[in-house]
């Protein structure tokens, strides 16, 4: 049986024979948390779950890096927020006055979005609170006492060496409040002297938490403080001579702690662009949960190896992704054949890793997203009518073919209604114009040729006198008519769309027509109303 990469990581970690495995993750709270920079927690959770499956104790720790300096004003804040640049996120006021501070304003929606993922044994930490509560005090003391060696380690990977009076600490300036413009140059006991680019000179007692270790030292210190045994992180940290390489040496030599098992991952781009909180180019987990269930986000993350490039689009490509997920689900339940046994094992394992809970005994009802975008608009969102459209177009699984909407089980009904809501939200927010339509109650003002009128007339007669088991049969019948008239398919289908929705384009014609009330279509094609 093939193994998923999260399983292999768990098995390798288990060789360490620890009483508990703590999988670390962290996110900088510089604005809205998006799926591009929050993969850490989802990967960490998956590894923790795999460890527990093989009988190990494991938990996930997520650290909010909320003491880092604000470097850019995040979207959609006004530009006058630039006055807070350089200040720790934790010390910046809430932009709307609804939360305690900047951090809570952006962190709260993300943390709430984690609830549907049911992350077991999750511990959430605040970097700022860790400093303020003295958690980093001992590590800061050790780092300062070993400044010379830390400087040497840094310089091995720098083009320009650090100054001789450099200290691995960033004080918060008591004058301007910035943390990234101060230069710590001397210390005595717990007091650190610093100069700030604003012109202020001062001292800070590091036990008060009014400053922080420089990043690569902080990361190494955090590993030891929290006993981290494995940590996923973005590929930028994994670059040669990057954060992980430097922090690993510091962890080994300065803090006498083995660096965690690294799991670097590729960033997720959005429609080909790098996600950027400052530019407003991002897609959040909470946005995902409005158009898809949490398992589908897991599937998106875990279907490929972590360093494989990933580009996400919430537009038409999202429907393709949902089609893929549904296919994988059918294969996992033995409802569809995979191309070979190897593919079956691989896809089934991906599906299992993607699940929040154990797989239900029966495969969930999975009406096609793509078909629902059409059925939803025809039925104006009426669930009963949508179900009837699915039934009339052979879109129901065999076990539901003779089940009415009213008789659906609670599980099937909830699944169906939830997917309808997802499709509604997708249409409202991301559906392209060419996907959207409205069935016109009255004949729209249109121009059609005599040839198109004849085509519509013949189709109306066929609908009146013949029955079709599926849309394929009706599609073939329409082609017989247009070929007998010597018409181009485009002209024929334009006539259908023009008379029903007043547009030249629309959904797949055969299933669309069969989804509508037959008497309505016959009258409309005869141009009677």
Swiss-Prot record:
GO terms for cellular component: cytoplasm. It is found in: Cytoplasm. GO terms for biological process: lysyl-tRNA aminoacylation. A motif ('HIGH' region) lies at residues 29-37. A motif ('KMSKS' region) lies at residues 274-278. Its main location: cytoplasm. Pfam families: Anticodon_2 (PF19269), tRNA-synt_1f (PF01921). ATP binds at residue 277. It catalyses: tRNA(Lys) + L-lysine + ATP = L-lysyl-tRNA(Lys) + AMP + diphosphate. It is an enzyme of class 6 (ligase). InterPro entries: aa-tRNA-synth_I_cd-bd, aa-tRNA-synth_I_codon-bd_sub2, aa_tRNA-synth_I_cd-bd_sf, Lys-tRNA-ligase, Rossmann-like_a/b/a_fold. GO terms for molecular function: ATP binding; lysine-tRNA ligase activity; tRNA binding. SUPFAM superfamilies: An anticodon-binding domain of class I aminoacyl-tRNA synthetases, Nucleotidylyl transferase. Keywords: Aminoacyl-tRNA synthetase, ATP-binding, Cytoplasm, Ligase, Nucleotide-binding, Protein biosynthesis. Its EC number is 6.1.1.6. PANTHER family: LYSINE--TRNA LIGASE. HAMAP family: Lys_tRNA_synth_class1 (MF_00177). Belongs to the class-I aminoacyl-tRNA synthetase family. This is Lysine--tRNA ligase. It comes from Methanosphaera stadtmanae (strain ATCC 43021 / DSM 3091 / JCM 11832 / MCB-3).
């Amino acid at each position: 049986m093939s193994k998923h990469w999260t399983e292999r990581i768990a098995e390798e970690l288990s060789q360490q024979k620890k009483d508990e495995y703590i999988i670390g993750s962290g996110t900088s709270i510089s604005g809205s948390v998006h799926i591009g920079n929050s993969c850490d927690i989802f990967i960490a959770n998956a590894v923790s779950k795999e460890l527990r499956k093989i009988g190990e104790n494991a938990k996930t720790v997520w650290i909010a890096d909320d003491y880092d300096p604000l470097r850019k004003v995040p979207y959609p804040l006004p530009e006058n927020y630039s006055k807070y640049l350089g200040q720790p996120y934790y010390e910046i006021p809430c932009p709307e006055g609804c939360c305690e501070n900047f951090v809570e304003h952006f962190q709260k929606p993300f943390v709430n979005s984690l609830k549907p993922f049911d992350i077991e044994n999750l511990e959430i930490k605040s970097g700022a609170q860790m400093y303020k509560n003295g958690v980093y005090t001992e590590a800061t003391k050790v780092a300062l006492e070993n400044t010379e060696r830390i400087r040497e380690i840094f310089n091995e990977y720098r083009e320009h060496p650090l100054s001789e009076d450099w200290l691995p600490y960033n004080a918060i300036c008591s004058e301007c409040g910035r943390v990234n413009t101060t230069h710590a140059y001397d210390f005595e006991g717990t007091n650190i002297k610093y100069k700030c680019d604003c012109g202020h000179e001062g001292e800070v007692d590091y036990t008060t938490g009014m400053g922080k270790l420089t990043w690569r030292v902080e990361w190494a210190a955090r590993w030891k403080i929290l006993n981290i045994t494995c940590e996923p992180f973005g590929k930028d940290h994994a670059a040669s001579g990057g954060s992980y390489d430097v922090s690993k040496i510091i962890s080994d030599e300065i803090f006498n702690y083995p660096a965690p098992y690294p799991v670097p991952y590729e960033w997720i781009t959005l429609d080909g662009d790098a996600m950027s909180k400052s530019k407003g180019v991002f897609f959040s987990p909470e946005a995902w949960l409005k158009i898809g269930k949490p398992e589908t986000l897991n599937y998106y993350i875990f279907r490929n190896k972590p360093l494989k490039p990933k580009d996400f689009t919430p537009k038409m490509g999202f429907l393709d992704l949902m089609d893929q997920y549904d296919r994988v689900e059918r294969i996992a339940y033995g409802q569809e054949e995979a191309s070979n046994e190897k593919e079956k094992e691989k896809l089934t394992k991906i599906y299992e890793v993607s699940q929040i809970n154990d797989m239900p005994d029966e495969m969930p009802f999975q009406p096609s997203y793509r078909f629902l975008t059409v059925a939803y608009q025809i039925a104006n969102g009426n669930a009963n009518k949508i179900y009837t459209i699915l039934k009339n177009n052979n879109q129901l699984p065999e076990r539901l073919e003779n089940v009415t909407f009213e008789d659906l089980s609670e599980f099937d009904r909830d699944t169906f209604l939830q997917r309808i809501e997802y499709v509604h939200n997708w249409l409202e927010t991301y559906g392209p114009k060419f996907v959207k339509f409205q069935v016109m109650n009255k004949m729209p003002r249109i121009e059609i040729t005599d040839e198109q009128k004849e085509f519509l007339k013949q189709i109306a007669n066929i609908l009146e006198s013949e029955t079709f088991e599926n849309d394929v049969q009706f599609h073939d019948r329409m082609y017989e008519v247009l070929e007998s008239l010597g018409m181009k398919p485009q002209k024929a289908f334009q006539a259908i769309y023009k008379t029903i929705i007043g547009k030249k384009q629309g959904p797949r014609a055969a299933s669309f027509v069969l989804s509508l009330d037959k008497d309505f279509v016959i009258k409309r094609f005869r141009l009677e109303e």
